[in-house]
Design a protein with these regions (language model features):
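Conserved class I S-adenosyl-L-methionine
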Residues: 1-44, 55-59, 76-79, 134-157
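Class I SAM-dependent methyltransferase SAM/SAH-binding core
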Residues: 47-95
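A short acidic, Gly/Pro-enriched loop at the edge of an enzyme's catalytic core
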Residues: 93-104
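A short SAM/SAH-binding and catalytic strip from SAM-dependent methyltransferases
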Residues: 103-116
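A short glycine-rich, Lys/Arg-flanked "PGG" loop and its adjoining helix->strand segment in the class I
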Residues: 117-132
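Short alpha-helix
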Residues: 168-182
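C-terminal helical/coil "lid" or tail adjacent to the Rossmann-like core of SAM-dependent
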Residues: 187-240
Length: 258
């Protein structure tokens, strides 16, 4: 999952570029399939929605495309600028582009955006007629075991369980209908289970991606982390101590009519 902070102030996810690079690098590393779907071409104008630290934005730029990265995390945008990329701060719910892009691309960001219909309509406005929308993000069933464990511990401790799973993880049927309602021509929408190795362990994943859930427990944060990890150990950790997250991804390609 890749950063885009979009929730209210009390539950807002924040990001450190250094921490993300250390514990979340797999997000960009595992994006080969959706990048192939995008197939960027030289001189195309492309919007990378939820660009994060610019790892994939750089890959798009390397093809000769004219790419603009958009994100809400200033720290991650700073890291992207250090790569020499063109990026700006912006909310995926309030895209202010009009028929500017040949393609809109997004990897591991759309599940952070809680009003998907607004996002889809903004993407449609941003695209030129005949432009394409290509994205991958969390699909139905993504990190279900992890969220269930957090909710269980949160309930036992009297915490806000909603902070365990703030994401939008649609099925292909639901998302296809949303795209059609926004007048997109749906080319393909696929769901792919993708068990994902966590090289730095489950606790680092939890701290990186669900900080607001754990911080609500104050001085008990470390103990709550321990409890969630122990609940997950039997199903997501092997005999050698290697952790795997139960990722499920939805991959999308749609076209704006000419």
């Amino acid at each position: 999952m890749k950063p885009t902070s979009l929730n209210s102030s009390s539950s807002r996810q924040t990001w450190s570029a250094d921490t993300y690079s250390e514990h979340g690098r797999f997000v960009a590393d595992l994006a080969g399939a959706v990048f192939e779907w995008l197939a960027p071409q030289a001189r195309e104008k492309i919007l990378d929605l939820g660009c994060g630290d610019g790892a994939l934005t750089q890959k798009i730029a390397d093809t000769g495309a004219d790419v603009l990265g958009l994100d809400m995390s200033n720290d991650l945008l700073s890291a992207a600028r250090k790569r020499g990329l063109s990026v700006r701060s912006g909310d995926g719910h309030a895209l202010d582009f009009s028929a500017e892009f040949d393609a809109v691309f997004s990897n591991a960001a759309l599940h952070w955006m809680s009003m998907p219909e607004k996002v889809i309509h903004g993407i449609s406005r941003a695209l030129k007629p005949g432009g394409r929308f290509v994205a991958e993000f969390g699909g139905h069933g993504n990190v279900a075991a992890i969220v269930t464990a957090m909710r269980a511990v949160g309930a036992r401790r009297g915490g806000d369980q909603s902070l365990a799973g703030p994401w939008f993880f649609p099925s292909p049927e639901v998302y296809s209908e949303m795209l059609s309602d926004a007048s997109f021509d749906v080319c393909r929408v696929e769901l792919h289970p993708r068990p994902t190795s966590l090289k730095t362990g489950m606790k680092e994943w939890l701290k990186l991606f669900r900080k607001p859930f754990f911080e609500q427990f104050g001085d008990e944060t470390d103990n709550v982390l321990d409890e969630v990890e122990q609940l997950l150990r039997p199903s997501l950790c092997d005999a050698r101590g290697n952790w795997t997250a139960d990722y499920v991804r939805i991959r999308v390609e749609a076209m704006k009519p000419r």
